[in-house]
């Protein structure tokens, strides 16, 4: 790869800017480019001054005075790109603005100048100049430029702007594109390059309309990224106002609509449903307000429901369908999660990391989710699925979904009853094919018993039962239960891997699964096309067809 050469004609409009870091007259002016929530919580400015950085939650690394820019102490891709984003350097500039102490600015300048000497475009590792590190690094460089006028910094920002404005490198309809536009606009506003600022606003408007649909759902297939996108759009709109640019209505409107989506994607315990590349430890630290409805179906592929808002012991579920897997999505179509009586019941395997490992790719697979599989048929990745019917009552909701991910129509019907908590699921496939389904329970729940088509799990006094019936309403026996092994794993936090109990049904033409929280010995009966289940709070009856 040839090093990027920036011709003089492309350089920033640098009229009259000369000199280096200067001793500040206290107090130092605090700038909009440096203040804000873009600075990471770790490392602190004092940590950086000591030559020690802690990134992406991993243990601190001693960088020393002379930094090795090829360092990769954990062989972790996220660590590498955050290292080269230089946001940790930005903590020094913020400390300088807040304290007036020149030592912070001098070290920030020293670090950044050294980085630029060793990491010219085309002369460093390719990931250093990929779209996201470039975008995030720009914020730190623009912040530094508010106090350092050296030509090398202007050259660096010009190189960043050239990449950020290159059409073939732009990630349209994705959170990376949003960050690219924020970065390009920051440079354009800093140096009065209206061509860059206008390009950034035009692209951002188009990207936001692609990334956030008209209902407010994020299309990246991992709801936790909606929190990130919402925060970044607040930054973008603030920067526009600071730059004298009118905020387009489409950007403001779509950003506001994300609040309801984030609220519906958040479980009663305050943590987001860990769908796609979403960790179970994601807690939206933002005010979303309380949506008017307890149940919401998003055309982009989500159905959410809960008993009521504001109560941690409310029941809650998620159901996935929609466009085939892309961006931060997993092969979770027709999958469900379930939370009841103040705890997780059914969970996905979760998000482990972005490392290229077998385990990472397994967590994205259909086997890592609560889905039906078609026996003897090959799974076809990235297949879209459809919600074909729904019945949305206050205390009971039912859904019917279908796709051809196995080359034949597979169908899942889901019924959730609130108050007397149950989730009932009916799975089948066309063409006489048999199905087998997978149920992954929260890692705190361990096997108590497995007999007669009833699997009971528990955590201390709390019990939950899984009952499986055939199309004739007879017990379906022969469940396989494993903890660990091939299927029995979850990743509740970043880079963690814990054993969890997984129940795999026997193969059958039609499988009715009933999950009953809070019950150890559920009584289930069938009569006249209806199924009656005795829960901890009373009996529940529903059509054997569910919908």
Task: Annotate each predicted stretch with a short phrase.
Residues 77, 154, 352-547:
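CBM-like, beta-strand-rich accessory domains located in the C-terminal region of large
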Residues 77-255:
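Aromatic-lined, polymer-binding surfaces characteristic
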Residues 185, 213-347, 351, 393, ...:
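Carbohydrate-active enzyme catalytic cores, enriched for enzymes
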Residues 24-63:
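Extreme N-terminal leader/anchor segments
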Residues 1-23:
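Secretory targeting and sorting signals
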Residues 137, 306, 411-414:
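Short, cationic motifs built from Arg/Lys/His that form the positively charged side of catalytic pockets
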Residues 55-82, 93-98:
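Asp/Glu-centered strand-loop micro-motifs enriched in Gly/Pro and often flanked by an aromatic residue
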Residues 73, 168, 309, 321-325, ...:
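Short, well-ordered turn and helix-capping elements at secondary-structure junctions
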């Amino acid at each position: 790869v040839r090093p990027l050469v920036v011709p003089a004609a492309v350089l920033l409009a640098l009229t009259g800017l000369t000199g280096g870091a200067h001793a500040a007259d206290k107090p130092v002016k605090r700038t909009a480019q440096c203040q804000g929530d873009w600075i990471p919580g770790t490392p602190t400015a004092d940590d950086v001054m000591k030559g020690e950085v802690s990134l992406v939650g991993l243990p601190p690394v001693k960088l020393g005075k002379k930094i090795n820019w090829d360092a990769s102490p954990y062989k972790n891709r996220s660590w590498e790109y955050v290292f080269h984003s230089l946001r940790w350097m930005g903590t020094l500039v913020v400390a300088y603005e807040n304290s007036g102490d020149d030592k912070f600015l001098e070290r920030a300048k020293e670090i950044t100048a050294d980085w630029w000497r060793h990491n010219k475009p085309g002369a460093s590792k390719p990931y250093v100049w990929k779209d996201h590190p470039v975008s995030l690094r720009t914020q730190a460089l623009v912040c530094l430029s508010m106090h350092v006028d050296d030509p090398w910094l202007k050259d660096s920002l010009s190189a960043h702007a050239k990449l950020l404005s290159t059409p073939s490198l732009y990630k349209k309809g994705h959170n990376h594109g949003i960050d690219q536009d924020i970065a390009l606009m920051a440079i354009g506003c800093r140096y009065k390059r209206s061509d860059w600022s206008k390009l950034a606003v035009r692209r951002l408007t188009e990207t936001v309309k692609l990334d956030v649909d008209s209902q407010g759902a994020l299309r990246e297939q991992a709801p936790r990224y909606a929190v990130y996108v919402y925060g970044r759009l607040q930054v973008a709109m603030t920067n526009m106002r600071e730059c004298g640019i009118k905020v387009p209505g489409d950007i403001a409107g779509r950003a506001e609509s994300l609040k309801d989506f984030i609220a519906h994607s958040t479980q009663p315990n305050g943590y987001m449903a860990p769908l796609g590349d979403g960790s179970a430890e994601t807690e939206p630290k933002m005010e979303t307000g309380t949506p008017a409805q307890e149940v919401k179906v998003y055309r982009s592929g989500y159905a959410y429901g809960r008993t009521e808002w504001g109560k941690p012991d409310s029941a809650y579920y998620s159901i996935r369908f929609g466009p085939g897997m892309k961006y931060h999505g997993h092969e979770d179509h027709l999958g469900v999660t379930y939370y009841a009586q103040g705890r997780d019941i059914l969970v996905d395997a979760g998000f482990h990391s972005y490392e290229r490992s077998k385990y990472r790719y397994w967590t994205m697979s259909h086997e890592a989710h609560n889905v039906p599989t078609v026996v003897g048929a090959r799974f076809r990745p990235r297949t879209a699925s459809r919600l074909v019917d729904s019945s949305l009552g206050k205390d009971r909701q039912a859904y019917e979904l279908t796709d051809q991910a196995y080359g034949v129509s597979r169908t899942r019907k889901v019924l959730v009853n609130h108050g007397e908590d149950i989730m009932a699921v009916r799975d089948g496939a066309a063409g006489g094919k048999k199905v087998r389904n997978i149920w992954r329970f929260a890692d705190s729940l361990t096997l108590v018993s497995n007999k007669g088509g009833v699997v009971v799990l528990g955590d201390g006094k709390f019990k939950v039962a899984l009952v499986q019936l055939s199309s004739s309403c007879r017990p379906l026996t022969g469940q396989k239960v494993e903890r660990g092994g091939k299927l029995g794993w979850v990743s509740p936090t970043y880079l963690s891997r814990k054993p969890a109990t997984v129940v795999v049904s026997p193969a059958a033409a039609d499988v009715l699964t009933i999950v009953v929280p809070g019950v150890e010995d559920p009584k289930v009966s069938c009569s006249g096309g209806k199924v009656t289940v005795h829960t901890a709070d009373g009996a529940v009856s529903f059509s054997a067809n569910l919908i």
